[in-house]
Curated annotation (Swiss-Prot):
Keywords: Cytoplasm, Protein biosynthesis. The lineage of its organism: Bacteria, Pseudomonadati, Pseudomonadota, Alphaproteobacteria, Hyphomicrobiales. This is Ribosome-recycling factor. GO terms for biological process: cytoplasmic translational termination. Responsible for the release of ribosomes from messenger RNA at the termination of protein biosynthesis. May increase the efficiency of translation by recycling ribosomes from one round of translation to another. Belongs to the RRF family. InterPro entries: Ribosome_recyc_fac, Ribosome_recyc_fac_dom, RRF_sf. One of its GO terms (molecular function) is ribosomal large subunit binding.
Amino acid sequence: MATPEFDLNDIKRRMQGAVASLSKDLGSLRTGRATPSLLDPIQVDAYGSMMPMAQVATVSVPEPRLLSISVWDRSMVTAVEKAIRESDLGLNPQTEGQTIRLRIPEMNEQRRKEMVKVAHKYTEEARVAVRHVRRDGLDHLKKLLKDSAISEDDEKRQATDVQKATDQYIAEIDGVLASKEKEIMQV
């Protein structure tokens, strides 16, 4: 039984946002496999402003270790190439007309371990975000109890629901990390 002042669904929605943000962050990590999301963080200087890669080109994966970037405007090819070179991905673009090819080199063991550390950092940030949402929810419940808007039993029941949601989303975050870690360490 939810009170009008307390919305568990809002808390769950905010926790799900932390999981979605983690998935996006982990998607941009290099794993040794070619994925279009690898280029998502790259901004291209196009027509006087910075634009995401997806707004100036189409990225496809013709082979497991090759990205093919089809630039829509021929005049943007050099800008896209420059943006890739200046990114911290360490990739060397090869231009063929309006198409840019990116070979994704196999990562060595040290680089894989570095990527796993970065993945753990992103994951910890997501866990902290979920815990902040939990704290906000519990603080709100305590305020409602103090203002006599809900009974002590309702506060305890809803606090238990908030903790269950927290545990569920932390487990989901751990699952996302385990999957990404396996993908990174796979040779």
